[in-house]
Amino acid sequence: MRDAIPGAKEDPNYNATGISVVLHPVSPKIPSMHFNTRFIKTTQEWFGGGMDITPCVIFEDEKKYHRGLEVLCNKYDKSYYPKFKKWCDDYFFLKHRNEPRGVGGIFFDYLQTGDWGKDFEFVQGVGTYFHQFIKNTLIALKDEAVSY
C-alpha cells in the first residue's frame, strides 16, 4: 500500500485531514449530493476532493450546476474543469449498467501546483460553491409539492 501513496514509500508517517458531507434529502425533487475535500501530507503533500449530484428525478438545474463548477475552476486554471469533470464522470460510471451515476460534478486528487495558497484557495472555493449551490438552488425545491 505504501507504494501506492506518493511519499509513503520513503517514510510511512503521514497526516491527513478532510471534510465529507453527504446530503440525503427527504424530497425526491432535491438530488442527493456529495462533497469532500482533503489534505494529505507524507514526504509530499497535496489536496484532493470533489462533488457530485445524484438526482432521483430529472434535475432541471444540471446546466446551472455544471456552469458554476466551470466558472469556479476557470478562476484557478482553465484546464481544471474539463480534467476534473472527466475524472468524476469516469469514477462514477456504472460499468455493469453502462450508464453514469447521476449528473456528475468534479473530482481531483494529487493537486499540488507549487502554490500552496492558491491550491488551498481553490479547495475552499469548492466548499463554498457546494454551500452556495445548496442555499441558492436546492433550498428553493424543499417546499415544492410531491405526490407519493
List each model region and its residues:
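Aromatic- and glycine-enriched beta-alpha-beta binding-site module
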Residues: 2-63
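Long, contiguous internal "core" modules enriched in hydrophobic/ aromatic residues
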Residues: 45-147
